[in-house]
Amino acid sequence: MNHKSSKGISNWLFAVILITPLIIVVGGFAFFQYQKRVVPAETSKIETKKEDAKIEEKKPEIIRPTSLGLNTLFFGDVFWGRYVDDWSKASDLKFAYPFSGLNTFQRENYQAWIADLECPITSTYINSATQDNLLKFSCPVGYTAEAAKWFNAFTLANNHMDNMQEVDGLKQTRDNLDVNKIQYFGHYDNSFRDATGRDEICEIVSFKSKPVFPEIKDNQIKMDSEFLIPVAMCGYHNVFKLPTEADLAVITEYSKYLPTIIMPHQGQEYKTVADSLQETYYRKMIDLGADAVIGDHTHSVQNTEAYKGKLIVYSMGNFIFDQQTAPLYRQGIGVNLDFNFFMDENLKKWSELAVNCTGFKDNCLAEAKMQKLIKPKFSLKVDLIPTDNSNKLAKKADEDVATKILKQAKWAETKTKLDYSYAGK
């Protein structure tokens, strides 16, 4: 046996035995240090996922409105034919001229403007002298797009809407309003019925509302949606022929289901006090369920009345018109009806249905009956805003003129007798 080899092997084994524990200790220490770095990172990822899950669980609560506001302003006769057209052509503003003073009414405070369109809109041009001599009106199409920046709906129930029937003036008018997304209601003939027997007196029109929300708290957001409100509007042309009982009965079909506003065209021109026929028929409209009657035609402001607590305006007078010879013809009133509809399941369904209530002769009322909807609950504030068409431009009346107009309308007496408390029950 080689003693040198035996001794070398012994030394090698001794070295292995000596080094192995050291390797184990060093390796263990290194692994421990690695774990210190890696495990917290993995734990951190897990914790982050948990936090993300918690955040997802805390999605903001969507809050519905507690009520829907609808601030409306009604005006009298609107007309851009005859001399209004001449003034506009002479102005740098052209088609925008007749409406250039309307910003004095702070349009942004209202959801809807409604007026009487006292002229068919047609492509047939008639000069101002001929319109004046014949009292036959035709309003140029070009103004309609400008009107749409201000007005949401027009009544067509008046004594000039049939002036251009040889060129199908009523249809042209409706077509032009449709193109510009202006709603309309009423017919120059109350007795007209279509092939199905349906009248064209009343329509359900829909307006964008102003939603009213409760105080929004942390982790809550307002419902981001457009809420529409439907309102029944009826136009009656009573100048040459008074409405029949059947014509008037149409009001009840709508007033059972919706706030219903009547815009009759009646009375002796240039008178400041309503005649007995106006009183009889306008009061009858209230008896049939109308929530307000807002008249025009006389080209003058007439008295107002609270009948059974409800508003009757016998005539609003001119608004945008070309009669300039006396203050009587230049002055008018805007009627401010400020609604607040109380949100409940019934109103929610009405608002959803209202999307389909913007077209002429739609099936909105029939659909409401099918859904068994009832008249929404609402509160109503009423005010008069005097208007002034002097210097050939419609605008809000100054304080002195406004005082005279309100006195002529007997507004101080009327407003104390209005009572719309029934509407919220």
Can you say where each PLM-predicted feature lies in the sequence?
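Short acidic, glycine-rich surface-loop motifs adjacent to enzyme active sites
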Residues: Y110-T122, N158-N159, P230-M233, Y254-V273
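Conserved beta-sheet core of the metallophosphoesterase superfamily
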Residues: W150-A153, S276-V335, F341-M343
